[in-house]
Amino acid sequence: MVDMMILEIIKSEGLAHKSYFIGSKGEAAVIDPRRDCDSYVNYSKKHEMQITHIFETHCNEDYVIGSMELSKRVGAPIYHSKNLDFNYGNIVEEGNKFQIGDIELEIIETPGHTRESISLLLKDKAVSDDAYIIFTGDTLFAGEVGRTDIYGDDVREEMAGKLYDSLHKKIIPLGDHVLVFPAHGSGSVCGKDIRESEFTTIGYEKKTNPMLQKSKEEFIEHKLNEKMVKAPYFKKMEVYNKDGAPLLCRLPYLKPLGITEFKEHIGTSQVVDVRMAASFAGGHVSGTLNIWKRGLTYFAGWMLNYEDPIIVIDENNQSIDEIARYLIRIGYDNIYGYLAGGFTLWANSGEKIEKIDTWSVHDLKERQSDESLFIIDVREIGEREEGYIEGSHHIYVGDLKDHLKEVPDDKYIVVYCDTGNRASIAASVLKTNGYKEVANVLGSIRAWKAAGYPLVKD
Protein backbone atom coordinates (compact mmCIF):
# COMPACT_ATOMS: atom_id res chain seq x y z
CA MET A 1 0.00 0.00 0.00
CA VAL A 2 1.29 3.47 -0.95
CA ASP A 3 1.74 5.82 2.06
CA MET A 4 2.24 9.09 0.19
CA MET A 5 -0.56 11.05 -1.44
CA ILE A 6 -1.36 10.10 -5.04
CA LEU A 7 -2.78 12.48 -7.65
CA GLU A 8 -3.52 11.25 -11.17
CA ILE A 9 -4.93 13.43 -13.97
CA ILE A 10 -7.22 11.65 -16.43
CA LYS A 11 -7.59 13.60 -19.67
CA SER A 12 -10.41 13.14 -22.16
CA GLU A 13 -9.18 14.25 -25.57
CA GLY A 14 -11.55 16.24 -27.72
CA LEU A 15 -13.56 17.40 -24.73
CA ALA A 16 -10.40 18.83 -23.16
CA HIS A 17 -11.86 17.46 -19.92
CA LYS A 18 -9.80 16.63 -16.87
CA SER A 19 -10.85 14.40 -14.00
CA TYR A 20 -8.82 13.48 -10.96
CA PHE A 21 -7.94 10.40 -8.94
CA ILE A 22 -6.54 11.32 -5.52
CA GLY A 23 -5.66 8.89 -2.78
CA SER A 24 -3.88 8.23 0.49
CA LYS A 25 -3.35 5.19 2.72
CA GLY A 26 -5.54 2.78 0.81
CA GLU A 27 -8.43 5.17 0.13
CA ALA A 28 -9.17 7.28 -2.94
CA ALA A 29 -11.60 9.84 -4.32
CA VAL A 30 -12.47 10.66 -7.93
CA ILE A 31 -13.48 14.16 -9.01
CA ASP A 32 -15.67 14.70 -12.10
CA PRO A 33 -15.30 11.20 -13.64
CA ARG A 34 -16.05 10.53 -17.27
CA ARG A 35 -18.50 7.87 -18.36
CA ASP A 36 -15.97 5.27 -19.53
CA CYS A 37 -14.57 4.82 -16.06
CA ASP A 38 -12.05 1.99 -16.43
CA SER A 39 -9.11 4.41 -15.90
CA TYR A 40 -10.16 5.08 -12.30
CA VAL A 41 -10.63 1.40 -11.56
CA ASN A 42 -7.21 0.67 -13.05
CA TYR A 43 -5.58 3.38 -10.92
CA SER A 44 -7.23 2.00 -7.80
CA LYS A 45 -5.70 -1.40 -8.57
CA LYS A 46 -2.30 0.07 -9.45
CA HIS A 47 -2.07 2.04 -6.20
CA GLU A 48 -3.90 -0.58 -4.09
CA MET A 49 -6.58 1.89 -3.07
CA GLN A 50 -10.32 1.57 -2.63
CA ILE A 51 -12.37 4.36 -4.23
CA THR A 52 -14.48 5.61 -1.32
CA HIS A 53 -15.80 8.96 -2.59
CA ILE A 54 -16.97 10.38 -5.94
CA PHE A 55 -17.37 14.16 -6.26
CA GLU A 56 -19.02 16.29 -8.95
CA THR A 57 -18.09 19.97 -9.09
CA HIS A 58 -21.32 20.87 -10.93
CA CYS A 59 -23.99 19.59 -13.32
CA ASN A 60 -21.93 19.45 -16.49
CA GLU A 61 -23.41 20.54 -19.80
CA ASP A 62 -20.72 19.37 -22.26
CA TYR A 63 -20.38 15.67 -21.40
CA VAL A 64 -22.08 12.85 -19.50
CA ILE A 65 -20.71 12.63 -15.98
CA GLY A 66 -19.56 9.11 -15.12
CA SER A 67 -20.40 9.16 -11.42
CA MET A 68 -23.22 6.62 -11.53
CA GLU A 69 -21.21 4.36 -13.81
CA LEU A 70 -18.22 4.43 -11.47
CA SER A 71 -20.37 4.10 -8.35
CA LYS A 72 -22.00 0.99 -9.83
CA ARG A 73 -18.58 -0.58 -10.33
CA VAL A 74 -16.88 0.32 -7.05
CA GLY A 75 -19.76 0.98 -4.64
CA ALA A 76 -18.62 4.47 -3.65
CA PRO A 77 -21.15 7.20 -2.78
CA ILE A 78 -21.58 10.27 -5.01
CA TYR A 79 -21.48 13.83 -3.67
CA HIS A 80 -22.64 17.08 -5.26
CA SER A 81 -24.06 20.46 -4.30
CA LYS A 82 -27.28 21.01 -2.36
CA ASN A 83 -28.10 23.88 -4.72
CA LEU A 84 -29.54 21.70 -7.48
CA ASP A 85 -32.24 19.07 -7.07
CA PHE A 86 -30.22 16.06 -8.27
CA ASN A 87 -32.13 12.80 -8.51
CA TYR A 88 -29.21 10.70 -7.29
CA GLY A 89 -26.27 10.95 -4.93
CA ASN A 90 -25.73 12.87 -1.69
CA ILE A 91 -25.70 16.62 -1.13
CA VAL A 92 -22.84 18.71 0.25
CA GLU A 93 -22.56 22.32 1.32
CA GLU A 94 -20.01 24.95 2.28
CA GLY A 95 -17.59 23.73 4.92
CA ASN A 96 -18.31 19.99 4.69
CA LYS A 97 -15.10 18.00 5.12
CA PHE A 98 -14.19 14.50 3.98
CA GLN A 99 -11.26 12.34 5.06
CA ILE A 100 -9.52 10.11 2.49
CA GLY A 101 -6.52 8.60 4.27
CA ASP A 102 -4.40 11.60 5.27
CA ILE A 103 -6.18 13.82 2.76
CA GLU A 104 -8.85 16.26 3.87
CA LEU A 105 -11.21 17.65 1.21
CA GLU A 106 -13.28 20.69 2.11
CA ILE A 107 -16.28 21.87 0.09
CA ILE A 108 -16.28 25.49 -1.05
CA GLU A 109 -19.42 26.76 -2.79
CA THR A 110 -18.30 28.71 -5.89
CA PRO A 111 -21.42 29.59 -7.93
CA GLY A 112 -21.23 31.54 -11.16
CA HIS A 113 -20.66 29.09 -13.97
CA THR A 114 -23.69 27.30 -12.55
CA ARG A 115 -25.64 27.90 -9.36
CA GLU A 116 -24.51 24.63 -7.81
CA SER A 117 -20.79 24.85 -8.67
CA ILE A 118 -18.43 23.78 -5.92
CA SER A 119 -14.66 23.62 -5.57
CA LEU A 120 -12.74 21.15 -3.41
CA LEU A 121 -9.89 22.36 -1.21
CA LEU A 122 -7.25 19.76 -0.37
CA LYS A 123 -4.97 19.39 2.64
CA ASP A 124 -2.42 16.60 3.03
CA LYS A 125 -2.60 16.28 6.81
CA ALA A 126 0.47 14.04 6.86
CA VAL A 127 2.49 17.07 5.74
CA SER A 128 0.67 20.18 6.94
CA ASP A 129 -2.63 21.60 8.11
CA ASP A 130 -2.40 24.20 5.34
CA ALA A 131 -4.36 23.69 2.13
CA TYR A 132 -2.26 23.63 -1.03
CA ILE A 133 -4.51 22.30 -3.83
CA ILE A 134 -7.93 23.36 -5.05
CA PHE A 135 -10.01 21.57 -7.68
CA THR A 136 -11.99 24.40 -9.26
CA GLY A 137 -14.26 22.62 -11.74
CA ASP A 138 -15.43 25.18 -14.31
CA THR A 139 -14.95 28.20 -12.02
CA LEU A 140 -11.28 29.02 -12.65
CA PHE A 141 -9.13 27.77 -15.53
CA ALA A 142 -5.57 28.47 -16.59
CA GLY A 143 -5.84 31.89 -18.23
CA GLU A 144 -9.64 32.01 -18.15
CA VAL A 145 -12.76 31.68 -16.02
CA GLY A 146 -15.98 29.74 -16.57
CA ARG A 147 -18.70 30.85 -18.95
CA THR A 148 -21.79 32.42 -17.39
CA ASP A 149 -24.35 32.12 -20.19
CA ILE A 150 -25.61 28.60 -19.48
CA TYR A 151 -28.95 29.73 -18.03
CA GLY A 152 -29.64 32.33 -20.72
CA ASP A 153 -29.45 36.10 -21.01
CA ASP A 154 -32.06 36.85 -18.33
CA VAL A 155 -29.73 35.87 -15.50
CA ARG A 156 -26.38 36.37 -17.21
CA GLU A 157 -25.54 39.50 -15.23
CA GLU A 158 -26.47 37.79 -11.97
CA MET A 159 -24.32 34.73 -12.75
CA ALA A 160 -21.36 36.89 -13.80
CA GLY A 161 -21.57 38.72 -10.48
CA LYS A 162 -21.69 35.43 -8.59
CA LEU A 163 -18.65 34.13 -10.48
CA TYR A 164 -16.69 37.29 -9.72
CA ASP A 165 -17.51 36.96 -6.02
CA SER A 166 -16.59 33.27 -6.01
CA LEU A 167 -13.21 34.08 -7.51
CA HIS A 168 -12.38 37.11 -5.37
CA LYS A 169 -14.01 36.15 -2.08
CA LYS A 170 -13.53 32.37 -2.05
CA ILE A 171 -10.58 31.31 -4.23
CA ILE A 172 -8.05 34.16 -4.46
CA PRO A 173 -7.88 34.67 -0.65
CA LEU A 174 -6.64 31.08 -0.26
CA GLY A 175 -3.13 32.28 -1.13
CA ASP A 176 -0.76 32.53 -4.08
CA HIS A 177 0.87 29.19 -3.27
CA VAL A 178 -2.28 27.11 -3.80
CA LEU A 179 -2.20 24.83 -6.84
CA VAL A 180 -5.23 25.02 -9.13
CA PHE A 181 -6.50 21.92 -10.94
CA PRO A 182 -9.45 22.84 -13.21
CA ALA A 183 -11.91 20.56 -15.00
CA HIS A 184 -10.86 21.62 -18.51
CA GLY A 185 -7.85 22.55 -20.59
CA SER A 186 -7.39 24.39 -23.87
CA GLY A 187 -10.02 23.59 -26.50
CA SER A 188 -12.94 23.20 -24.12
CA VAL A 189 -16.26 24.84 -24.92
CA CYS A 190 -16.55 25.82 -21.25
CA GLY A 191 -14.15 28.75 -21.51
CA LYS A 192 -13.17 30.93 -24.43
CA ASP A 193 -9.41 31.34 -23.99
CA ILE A 194 -8.25 28.55 -21.70
CA ARG A 195 -4.48 28.17 -21.68
CA GLU A 196 -3.04 24.69 -22.03
CA SER A 197 -1.42 23.88 -18.71
CA GLU A 198 -1.36 20.77 -16.56
CA PHE A 199 -2.14 22.94 -13.55
CA THR A 200 -1.63 26.51 -12.40
CA THR A 201 -1.47 28.48 -9.15
CA ILE A 202 -3.61 31.21 -7.68
CA GLY A 203 -0.60 33.53 -7.67
CA TYR A 204 0.19 32.91 -11.32
CA GLU A 205 -3.42 33.47 -12.32
CA LYS A 206 -3.53 36.72 -10.35
CA LYS A 207 -0.60 37.96 -12.44
CA THR A 208 -1.49 36.56 -15.87
CA ASN A 209 -5.22 35.82 -16.11
CA PRO A 210 -6.85 38.87 -17.76
CA MET A 211 -10.22 38.07 -16.18
CA LEU A 212 -8.74 38.46 -12.70
CA GLN A 213 -7.42 41.95 -13.52
CA LYS A 214 -10.88 43.43 -14.00
CA SER A 215 -13.09 45.30 -11.57
CA LYS A 216 -16.45 43.72 -10.83
CA GLU A 217 -18.17 46.11 -13.23
CA GLU A 218 -15.63 45.39 -15.99
CA PHE A 219 -15.89 41.65 -15.35
CA ILE A 220 -19.68 41.65 -15.63
CA GLU A 221 -19.59 43.84 -18.74
CA HIS A 222 -17.12 41.46 -20.37
CA LYS A 223 -19.28 38.47 -19.55
CA LEU A 224 -22.42 40.17 -20.90
CA ASN A 225 -20.65 40.77 -24.22
CA GLU A 226 -18.95 37.37 -24.43
CA LYS A 227 -20.15 35.43 -27.46
CA MET A 228 -19.99 31.66 -27.21
CA VAL A 229 -22.21 29.11 -28.92
CA LYS A 230 -24.33 26.62 -26.99
CA ALA A 231 -24.63 23.25 -28.67
CA PRO A 232 -28.12 21.69 -28.74
CA TYR A 233 -26.80 18.54 -27.07
CA PHE A 234 -26.09 20.55 -23.90
CA LYS A 235 -29.74 20.14 -22.91
CA LYS A 236 -29.43 16.36 -23.14
CA MET A 237 -26.31 16.41 -20.99
CA GLU A 238 -27.98 18.58 -18.36
CA VAL A 239 -30.89 16.13 -18.08
CA TYR A 240 -28.57 13.12 -17.87
CA ASN A 241 -26.36 14.81 -15.30
CA LYS A 242 -29.24 15.94 -13.12
CA ASP A 243 -31.34 12.78 -13.28
CA GLY A 244 -28.63 10.18 -13.90
CA ALA A 245 -27.47 8.77 -17.22
CA PRO A 246 -28.27 5.23 -18.38
CA LEU A 247 -25.71 2.73 -17.15
CA LEU A 248 -23.46 1.20 -19.81
CA CYS A 249 -21.43 -1.35 -17.80
CA ARG A 250 -19.21 -1.76 -20.88
CA LEU A 251 -18.39 -0.01 -24.13
CA PRO A 252 -20.95 -0.56 -26.91
CA TYR A 253 -20.07 -3.29 -29.39
CA LEU A 254 -19.68 -1.88 -32.89
CA LYS A 255 -20.57 -4.43 -35.54
CA PRO A 256 -18.20 -4.72 -38.53
CA LEU A 257 -20.29 -4.34 -41.69
CA GLY A 258 -19.42 -5.69 -45.09
CA ILE A 259 -20.28 -3.68 -48.20
CA THR A 260 -23.68 -5.33 -48.75
CA GLU A 261 -24.86 -4.94 -45.16
CA PHE A 262 -23.46 -1.42 -44.97
CA LYS A 263 -25.43 -0.37 -48.06
CA GLU A 264 -28.61 -1.79 -46.53
CA HIS A 265 -28.23 0.56 -43.57
CA ILE A 266 -27.33 3.77 -45.40
CA GLY A 267 -30.88 5.04 -45.74
CA THR A 268 -31.89 4.42 -42.13
CA SER A 269 -28.67 5.25 -40.28
CA GLN A 270 -26.48 8.25 -39.58
CA VAL A 271 -23.24 7.52 -41.43
CA VAL A 272 -20.24 9.50 -40.20
CA ASP A 273 -16.86 9.54 -41.94
CA VAL A 274 -14.27 10.41 -39.30
CA ARG A 275 -11.30 10.93 -41.62
CA MET A 276 -9.54 14.26 -41.96
CA ALA A 277 -10.80 16.90 -44.37
CA ALA A 278 -8.37 16.26 -47.24
CA SER A 279 -9.00 12.51 -47.19
CA PHE A 280 -12.77 12.99 -47.13
CA ALA A 281 -12.61 15.49 -49.99
CA GLY A 282 -10.55 13.09 -52.09
CA GLY A 283 -13.24 10.44 -51.95
CA HIS A 284 -16.14 9.38 -49.75
CA VAL A 285 -19.43 7.51 -49.73
CA SER A 286 -22.24 9.66 -51.10
CA GLY A 287 -24.57 11.02 -48.43
CA THR A 288 -22.13 10.70 -45.54
CA LEU A 289 -21.33 13.36 -42.98
CA ASN A 290 -17.71 14.24 -42.26
CA ILE A 291 -16.66 14.96 -38.67
CA TRP A 292 -12.97 14.45 -38.05
CA LYS A 293 -12.31 12.06 -35.17
CA ARG A 294 -11.22 14.59 -32.54
CA GLY A 295 -14.19 16.77 -33.49
CA LEU A 296 -16.72 14.07 -32.62
CA THR A 297 -16.84 14.99 -28.95
CA TYR A 298 -18.41 18.34 -29.79
CA PHE A 299 -19.74 18.47 -33.34
CA ALA A 300 -21.56 15.15 -33.15
CA GLY A 301 -23.76 17.00 -30.68
CA TRP A 302 -24.71 19.49 -33.39
CA MET A 303 -25.08 17.07 -36.26
CA LEU A 304 -26.38 13.73 -34.97
CA ASN A 305 -29.61 12.71 -33.27
CA TYR A 306 -29.89 10.31 -30.35
CA GLU A 307 -32.36 7.93 -32.00
CA ASP A 308 -31.11 6.68 -35.39
CA PRO A 309 -28.23 4.18 -35.48
CA ILE A 310 -24.74 5.58 -36.06
CA ILE A 311 -22.36 3.89 -38.48
CA VAL A 312 -18.72 4.96 -38.71
CA ILE A 313 -16.32 5.06 -41.64
CA ASP A 314 -12.62 5.34 -40.81
CA GLU A 315 -9.41 4.97 -42.79
CA ASN A 316 -8.28 1.59 -41.45
CA ASN A 317 -10.49 1.06 -38.35
CA GLN A 318 -7.60 1.22 -35.90
CA SER A 319 -9.51 3.72 -33.73
CA ILE A 320 -12.96 2.14 -33.39
CA ASP A 321 -12.68 1.76 -29.61
CA GLU A 322 -11.56 5.38 -29.28
CA ILE A 323 -14.43 6.58 -31.49
CA ALA A 324 -16.93 4.67 -29.34
CA ARG A 325 -15.52 6.35 -26.23
CA TYR A 326 -15.77 9.79 -27.81
CA LEU A 327 -19.43 9.25 -28.66
CA ILE A 328 -20.62 7.71 -25.39
CA ARG A 329 -19.01 10.57 -23.48
CA ILE A 330 -21.66 12.85 -24.96
CA GLY A 331 -24.48 10.34 -24.64
CA TYR A 332 -24.50 8.59 -28.02
CA ASP A 333 -25.29 5.02 -27.06
CA ASN A 334 -26.94 4.44 -30.46
CA ILE A 335 -23.67 3.41 -32.12
CA TYR A 336 -24.37 0.43 -34.37
CA GLY A 337 -21.32 -0.46 -36.42
CA TYR A 338 -18.55 0.47 -38.82
CA LEU A 339 -17.58 -0.22 -42.41
CA ALA A 340 -15.22 -3.20 -42.20
CA GLY A 341 -12.09 -2.44 -44.19
CA GLY A 342 -12.75 1.28 -43.98
CA PHE A 343 -13.10 3.56 -46.96
CA THR A 344 -10.34 1.63 -48.73
CA LEU A 345 -12.66 -1.39 -48.95
CA TRP A 346 -15.39 0.78 -50.46
CA ALA A 347 -13.03 2.23 -53.06
CA ASN A 348 -11.53 -1.15 -53.94
CA SER A 349 -15.00 -2.67 -54.36
CA GLY A 350 -15.78 -0.51 -57.36
CA GLU A 351 -18.50 1.46 -55.61
CA LYS A 352 -19.36 5.03 -56.58
CA ILE A 353 -17.23 7.69 -54.95
CA GLU A 354 -18.29 11.25 -54.17
CA LYS A 355 -15.76 14.09 -53.98
CA ILE A 356 -15.53 17.63 -52.67
CA ASP A 357 -13.30 20.20 -54.34
CA THR A 358 -10.37 21.52 -52.33
CA TRP A 359 -8.99 25.00 -52.76
CA SER A 360 -5.87 26.64 -51.46
CA VAL A 361 -6.11 30.15 -50.05
CA HIS A 362 -4.40 31.32 -53.23
CA ASP A 363 -7.25 29.87 -55.29
CA LEU A 364 -9.73 31.77 -53.15
CA LYS A 365 -7.74 35.02 -53.30
CA GLU A 366 -7.58 34.80 -57.08
CA ARG A 367 -11.37 34.38 -57.39
CA GLN A 368 -12.44 36.34 -54.30
CA SER A 369 -14.50 38.86 -56.30
CA ASP A 370 -15.99 36.27 -58.67
CA GLU A 371 -19.77 36.79 -58.54
CA SER A 372 -20.42 33.16 -59.40
CA LEU A 373 -19.10 32.20 -55.95
CA PHE A 374 -20.93 32.16 -52.64
CA ILE A 375 -18.33 32.17 -49.85
CA ILE A 376 -19.38 30.97 -46.39
CA ASP A 377 -17.52 31.56 -43.12
CA VAL A 378 -18.65 28.78 -40.75
CA ARG A 379 -16.71 29.89 -37.67
CA GLU A 380 -18.27 31.17 -34.45
CA ILE A 381 -19.41 34.79 -34.45
CA GLY A 382 -16.69 35.74 -31.96
CA GLU A 383 -14.03 34.43 -34.34
CA ARG A 384 -15.53 36.29 -37.28
CA GLU A 385 -15.54 39.56 -35.37
CA GLU A 386 -11.76 39.29 -35.10
CA GLY A 387 -11.50 39.38 -38.89
CA TYR A 388 -12.99 37.65 -41.94
CA ILE A 389 -12.43 37.28 -45.66
CA GLU A 390 -14.10 40.11 -47.51
CA GLY A 391 -17.20 39.09 -49.43
CA SER A 392 -17.96 36.06 -47.25
CA HIS A 393 -21.30 35.32 -45.60
CA HIS A 394 -21.50 34.09 -42.03
CA ILE A 395 -23.40 30.91 -41.14
CA TYR A 396 -22.06 28.98 -38.16
CA VAL A 397 -21.42 25.33 -39.04
CA GLY A 398 -23.76 24.11 -36.31
CA ASP A 399 -26.60 26.23 -37.69
CA LEU A 400 -26.06 25.46 -41.36
CA LYS A 401 -28.71 22.73 -41.61
CA ASP A 402 -31.34 25.22 -40.47
CA HIS A 403 -30.18 28.00 -42.80
CA LEU A 404 -29.83 26.24 -46.14
CA LYS A 405 -32.41 28.59 -47.67
CA GLU A 406 -29.80 31.33 -47.33
CA VAL A 407 -27.39 29.38 -49.54
CA PRO A 408 -28.11 29.75 -53.28
CA ASP A 409 -28.20 26.55 -55.29
CA ASP A 410 -27.10 28.22 -58.52
CA LYS A 411 -23.65 29.28 -57.35
CA TYR A 412 -20.35 27.62 -56.57
CA ILE A 413 -20.16 27.31 -52.77
CA VAL A 414 -16.79 27.90 -51.10
CA VAL A 415 -16.51 27.18 -47.37
CA TYR A 416 -13.84 28.18 -44.87
CA CYS A 417 -13.26 28.07 -41.09
CA ASP A 418 -10.00 28.33 -39.15
CA THR A 419 -8.17 25.26 -40.51
CA GLY A 420 -10.58 23.43 -42.84
CA ASN A 421 -11.97 20.84 -40.42
CA ARG A 422 -15.24 22.60 -39.61
CA ALA A 423 -15.48 23.67 -43.23
CA SER A 424 -15.39 20.00 -44.20
CA ILE A 425 -18.36 19.33 -41.91
CA ALA A 426 -20.21 22.17 -43.63
CA ALA A 427 -19.22 20.97 -47.09
CA SER A 428 -20.52 17.48 -46.32
CA VAL A 429 -23.82 18.96 -45.07
CA LEU A 430 -24.16 20.93 -48.29
CA LYS A 431 -23.35 17.90 -50.44
CA THR A 432 -25.89 15.70 -48.67
CA ASN A 433 -28.50 18.42 -49.25
CA GLY A 434 -28.05 18.48 -52.99
CA TYR A 435 -25.47 21.21 -53.58
CA LYS A 436 -23.37 20.06 -56.52
CA GLU A 437 -20.42 22.44 -56.57
CA VAL A 438 -18.79 22.81 -53.17
CA ALA A 439 -15.18 23.55 -52.23
CA ASN A 440 -13.39 23.42 -48.88
CA VAL A 441 -10.55 25.91 -48.41
CA LEU A 442 -7.82 23.80 -46.82
CA GLY A 443 -5.92 25.70 -44.16
CA SER A 444 -8.67 28.33 -44.21
CA ILE A 445 -8.06 31.43 -42.06
CA ARG A 446 -4.80 30.12 -40.65
CA ALA A 447 -3.37 29.67 -44.13
CA TRP A 448 -4.92 32.95 -45.32
CA LYS A 449 -3.05 34.83 -42.61
CA ALA A 450 0.16 32.90 -43.25
CA ALA A 451 -0.03 33.92 -46.90
CA GLY A 452 -0.26 37.56 -45.86
CA TYR A 453 -3.74 38.14 -47.22
CA PRO A 454 -5.91 40.78 -45.54
CA LEU A 455 -8.93 40.30 -43.30
CA VAL A 456 -11.67 42.84 -42.74
CA LYS A 457 -13.75 43.74 -39.69
CA ASP A 458 -17.21 45.25 -39.38
Name these PLM-found stretches:
Residues 30-31, 51-60, 79-82, 109-112, ...:
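Active-site neighborhood of phospho(di)ester-bond hydrolases with catalytic His/Asp-centered motifs
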